[in-house]
Each structure stands twice: as structure tokens, then as C-alpha cells.
Amino acid sequence: MGPLMVLFCLLFLYPGLADSAPSCPQNVNISGGTFTLSHGWAPGSLLTYSCPQGLYPSPASRLCKSSGQWQTPRATRSLSKAVCKPVRCPAPVSFENGIYTPRLGSYPVGGNVSFECEDGFILRGSPVRQCRPNGMWDGETAVCDNGAGHCPNPGISLGAVRTGFRFGHGDKVRYRCSSNLVLTGSSERECQGNGVWSGTEPICRQPYSYDFPEDVAPALGTSFSHMLGATNPTQKTKESLGRKIQIQRSGHLNLYLLLDCSQSVSENDFLIFKESASLMVDRIFSFEINVSVAIITFASEPKVLMSVLNDNSRDMTDVISSLENANYKDHENGTGTNTYAALNSVYLMMNNQMRLLGMETMAWQEIRHAIILLTDGKSNMGGSPKTAVDHIREILNINQKRNDYLDIYAIGVGKLDVDWRELNELGSKKDGERHAFILQDTKALHQVFEHMLDVSKLTDTICGVGNMSANASDQERTPWHVTIKPKSQETCRGALISDQWVLTAAHCFRDGNDHSLWRVNVGDPKSQWGKEFLIEKAVISPGFDVFAKKNQGILEFYGDDIALLKLAQKVKMSTHARPICLPCTMEANLALRRPQGSTCRDHENELLNKQSVPAHFVALNGSKLNINLKMGVEWTSCAEVVSQEKTMFPSLTDVREVVTDQFLCSGTQEDESPCKGESGGAVFLERRFRFFQVGLVSWGLYNPCLGSADKNSRKRAPRSKVPPPRDFHINLFRMQPWLRQHLGDVLNFLPL
């Protein structure tokens, strides 16, 4: 009998031999918690435990070995039963020049610790701190200081021990953590000549602690907000916007995104890594900065999907495409986590770029570099990643004077096998900043990248930025929106188009020319962020005359229904007050990421390029409502409805006598209709996370707020209404000569 026949017989008699590959036991439940598997019960699969908030799993994870047995956690000698344990926060080891209460060995979630200073010392930081469910204290380190040193007393974070008690220029202090706590931040700090301590404040953390998205997003967002606000090339900065990931207007940013694709990362988690990176790319490209993006995935070996040396690394579409094409199975034969090799790929890119540009050239020396490392675990092959970081710092000549030219953000995800010490070693350490984080899961990572931009930090008049985070107010979402009124009654809306000019409708002013009685409310009128401005000058289009065609039987005509208001003072930019982008300007061109040499016609073709264009306006209550602007043949059918309006136009024979090409048209059944009082407000679109005003609300055939004093009450027109609702908005592309005449010194207009 031949060998193949023997094999066939064995498989026939013992079918279990065909699928006898080992798998790990399934008796791995955790008391009070749940678990997930990265690759089922097969060897190489990572089992990750989760517990309700305020508890942590012990052990955090287990690995299915090739033998079909679960790997014993490092901290235990035997395979112990997984349990959920209560989270505790570290206690103070010492508190200088004061007392704290209560004095416990550690503190439960929700527990407080209070601090008081001795006479002659002033308390800096938080007098009361509470233990949070993630094992971290809220607030700031409490310090009792008498101001006697060249640098302020650096304090002692909870759970830490400090050596060094002199705070003069050149003096150093050193920190270590007690018991099993892990130190993040700088273990040594030096008092510098400017009175500031070097490095980052050290924090002692429980090994199982993690960061909340709401803590990480501001830390990252502040960095990018400063960078974005500092790189608007159409504005001149009068003050420093801070350090952070900042590049000068003449400089360039290289952004390196490193995505862990090792075996411990599930396919779904890798997808969220990609989505988070795409969010970052989308948002950073939506601002007018000079940026090149590198994309590197890594497991046992790195794979460069996009290099900063490629011209298409400056093109958002190409970068996003590279991310979308990243395949989870690209690294299926490599199970390790070689963070060193990933960072070394960045170093090699830098080295090649330096050779191309020349080490001594300004073109090379003015490039700033930001590395964002997304990983779920500890480096376990290839050598220490710190070595690669040292090489990167060396090639960039990072010293005290050039510290701003490199930022490394190390973000661990999943708590499972993330090594706090390694992340802290890799992350940059700069005064007042954090660069190392651990998030509970990939969903938290996605939240961070979704909400990381804090637009209140953008102090330039960068246009078209709305805060789209879940907790933003209506005014923060549309910060250009303003209310125009006499001393009491609100009458119209408008839009900030610069820090001193408002665009609105001319018919708002037809009842009188004494603009000294009028006011413009900018920001949220219901909060401290609202401010009332006087009008220095009103510019009404001379072509506007609502009764211009009365002799033709057209009782109201709204051609040239456009006006500009110059405010008596400039508006301070904030998350509640910011101009919208006006098409056909250099500011809008940068926001659209269009090439130099683009024209006004190019903007119109990009923004109004469909038969039905989704757009928005702002309601009386501040909410954003949806409409569809009809273009081409659909514009004609939209406008034709006016012929059915016999009250305003009893003898109309030609619709174009009323609806000229100055107007955009909306109002089909799925659209909202503007109310009386919403006239003059912006009609706007969103492109690449920026907002562009293409029209302003002028007039319509239906008032959904008629008979109601409630700003939140709107009534849709019945389907049987004749004529059906139609709304008309001044098309800003048709008002270019007038806008250029009056705003030529305010905005930078493109050729028509």
C-alpha cells in the first residue's frame, strides 16, 4: 500500500486527525467582567479582559501559546483565576510645608484628599483632589510655595518621592515612585535661566491606570490648534501663539503616523487605527499649513505606505488613499511588535531628506517633525526603540534651542500589555505638556482624534472653523452667526466675514437709515461669550429697491438684497466668534486646498457642482437647518413655482422678472424654510471640515414661524399648499463686483 493510501485510510478511520491543531481552553471567564479574543481560541490569539468602570482586571490579558495553553501572566507564577479588583489612587508620600487629610495608604474611587499650607506659604494647585475611576487624581499637584527660589517649587506629585530642595538657577531635582507605581514624565528636572523647570512634571501612576479621552483630546488638540493658528499665511502674527507642534509661516511640518499591526491587534482594532489616522489627516489638511504625511504600519517589520519624500505626501486624497489601502494581512507572517524598526524608518526618511536638501540649508533646518505612534502593546523585538529616538534627535540636532522642532506622541491603546515606562521613554518631555498616553480601547482613541481640535486656541482670523464636537453649543458650531437688531427687537441675522465686517441683507435696513440705533450681537447672547457691537458704517447696495417694479405689478422685488456692516470694534476670535470663509478669496482657496492660480469660477465649480447641493442656514434658536440648493435645470423648475404666488405677484408673466440669476433657490419638500427674522443669515456648505458661505437668506413664499413667538416652533407647510414653499438666497458668486469694491482692502480676492 502506497503512502498516500495509508494517509487516506488514517484520515478515514480517525477523522479527528485532520483538525487536531491545538487550541486553548475556553474556561477563562472573569468574575464580574468580560473578555475579547483577537483571533479566537487559536495559538497567537490575545485574550483581553474588561471590567466595569472603577474596577480593573487581574490579569489584564493572556496569550494563547503554540502548545495550546494560556501563557501565565508575568506577575504570577501560576495560571490564576481572573478577577475584577477595585481601582485605587496612590497616596501622598510627602507634602512639604503643609498637611493633607485624610491620611490613607491608597484612596478608593470617589475618595478625596485635601491640602492646607503652613503660615507664610501660598497654596498653588488644587486644594482638594478626587480619585477618578481610571486610577488617576483629578486637578493639579498641590504645592505650598513661598516664592523664594529662582524657579517655583516644582512640588511632589502623589505617590512620588523627590530629592533636591534648592530651586536656584541650575539646581536639579530628581523623582522616583513608591512601591509598584510607574513614573511618567521627567525623572530629573533642572531650573532654567528663564525661571522654568525643564522637562515634564512627573506623575506616579498605577500600572493599570489609563487616560480618559476628554483628558487626551485637549492635550493633543492644543498642540495642533497652536500649529494651525500659527500657520495661516494670509495673516501677520503680532504675538507668539505658544510652542506646541508649531511651525512658522515660512516653515513646513512633517507628520509621521505609525500604526501598530502586530498579532495582538485585532482586525477591527486596526480598522479603528486607520480611521483615527484618517481623521487626523482630514483635519490637518483642512487648514492652511505646509504639511507632508508619512504612513507606516509595523509588526515584526515596518511597511512604509507613504513617505514624506514623495510629492503626493502633500496631497490629502493620496494620503487618505494610502491609509484606506493598508491591509491588515500585510503583516500576517510577522507576529512581533518591532517599534524600533518603525521609528528607524522615520529616521531613514529624515536622513534621506537631509541629504537631498543639504544639512546646512534653511529648507532642511526649518522643517518641524511630529511623530504619532499608535500601539497596543510593548515592543518585544528589534532592540530598544529609545535607540531610534536618540538617532532621530541627533539628526535633527535637538537641543534646548531647537526643542520645538521635534514632538513625539506615544499613544498606547488597550491597557493590556502597554508598557508605561516605554511610552514615557519615547514621548517628548516639554514644560506644561504631555506626550505619552494610554487609552482604554480603540473606541476611546477614535473619540480623541474626532474631538482633538480646540478651536478656541486659534487666535488668528482663520475662516470657516466650527467646533463639531458632541458637546459644542450651537454658537460654537456656527461661530460666524450674528444677530442684528435695533435697541430691543431682533430683526435680521448676518455672518462675520472678517474680524470687523458683517455680511447681511439690504432689506433689513429699508425702514430707516439711522444705524446708530442698531446693534450687532456677536457670540452666544445667552452666555458670557456674547458681546454687543455698535455699527460704525453700513454699506447698502445702491441697486436695492424693494418697490422698484411696483409699476409692473411686482409688489416686492429683492434684487441686490445685500449689505455690509462695519463694526465699531474688532471682534476677538474665539470658539464663539470666527468669520466664515467667503468664496473667491485667497482665504477660501487655502481652506479648499486648491492650487495657486485658482479663480472664482473654479470655486463656483467646486462648491456648486451638482443639480442639488446640500447646504445649511441658522434658525432663530441657533440650530443648523438643512436645505438643498437647486442648480441648472433644477433651478429653473424650483423658480417656476413663483408664478403661482398671486398675492405678491398678481400679474406676473415672466418669473425671471422676480427671480433673477442673482438668486439661489431651495424649498423642496425635504427642505426647511427660513422664518421671518432669519433674513441676512449665511447660506453655507461644508467642505473638508471648513464652512463656506455661498449665499445669504433673502425672501421666500412661506414663513414656518408665522403666528408663533416660540423660536423653537416651526411648522412645515402642508403638501397641498399652493404655491409650495420656495426660498431665495442672494448668490454671492453673482455679487462679486460689489463685494470686491467694498472689501478689497479687507479680503484677498482671486481673479474672476
From Swiss-Prot:
This is Complement C2. Belongs to the peptidase S1 family. Glycans are attached at residues 29, 112, 290, 333, 467, 471, 621. Residues 254-452 form the VWFA domain. SMART domains: CCP (SM00032), Tryp_SPc (SM00020), VWA (SM00327). It is found in: Secreted; Cell surface. The keyword Secreted applies. Pfam families: Sushi (PF00084), Trypsin (PF00089), VWA (PF00092). The active site is at 507 (charge relay system), 561 (charge relay system), 679 (charge relay system). Keywords: Complement pathway, Disulfide bond, Glycoprotein, Hydrolase, Immunity, Innate immunity, Magnesium, Manganese, Metal-binding, Protease, Repeat, Secreted, Serine protease, Signal, Sushi.
